[in-house]
Every structure is written in C-alpha cells, then in structure tokens.
C-alpha cells in the first residue's frame, strides 16, 4: 500500500533549514531518516518543499479567480516536505511517521494514496 507522509513544521524550523549556517546541521536528522527508508526499500519518492512564503494559493468562486500570495493555511505548522512510501499496512506507515524528525517538533500526516476504481 502506498502512503504519503507530509512533514509539517513550525515556520522557525523551516527558516532554520534555509539558513546557510544552521541548515547543514538541521538537515542531518533528515538525511539519516531518508537513508533508513531507502535502505529498507520503502521510499518511492518525495521532496522538500520551498518555504511557505513562496507559495501562491489560487481559488475560483463564481467563475472569478482569486490569487493569494503565501499559503492558504493560517496555522503554526506548515508543510515542509513529503515522501511516498510503499509498505504492507497503515501500522507500518505510522511507524515510519513516528520516526520522522517532524513528529518531534511539528507533525507528520499519514494519508493513503487513493487509486481510481477499476
């Protein structure tokens, strides 16, 4: 079963990853985590997202397009990245989510990939 793990972090942590001085050390736990998933053969893909302030949100209401700079969500934790994993069960996906560096400082959302009906 495929699952998407979305890594949600406080803005301060996202800024730390982009800081030239703090970034390399901030990325070390992520390198270890991704390496562990790759070694286990469960990782199918994923990426770090650009900082939330680079986002543009588009909505359409009544045929009118509305564009907003920045992320739509007004929360303390914002999506910082994602990975697609292929594991046997939700329980196994939850175990990988628990190991995520985001889980200790923010959250990790686990969502199954929906397949179109046959």
Regions found by a protein language model. Name each.
Residues 1-118:
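Conserved, structured core segments of small domains
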């Amino acid at each position: 079963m495929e699952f998407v793990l979305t890594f949600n972090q406080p803005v301060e942590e996202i800024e730390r990853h982009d800081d030239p001085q703090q970034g390399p050390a901030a990325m070390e736990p992520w390198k270890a985590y991704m390496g562990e998933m790759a070694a286990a053969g469960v990782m199918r893909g994923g990426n770090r997202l650009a900082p939330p302030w680079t986002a543009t949100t588009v909505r359409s209401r009544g045929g009118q397009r509305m564009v907003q700079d920045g992320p739509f969500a007004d929360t303390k934790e914002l999506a910082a990245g994602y990975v697609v994993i292929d594991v046997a069960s939700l329980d196994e996906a939850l175990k990988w989510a628990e190991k995520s560096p985001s889980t200790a400082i923010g959250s990790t959302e686990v969502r199954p990939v929906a397949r179109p009906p046959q």
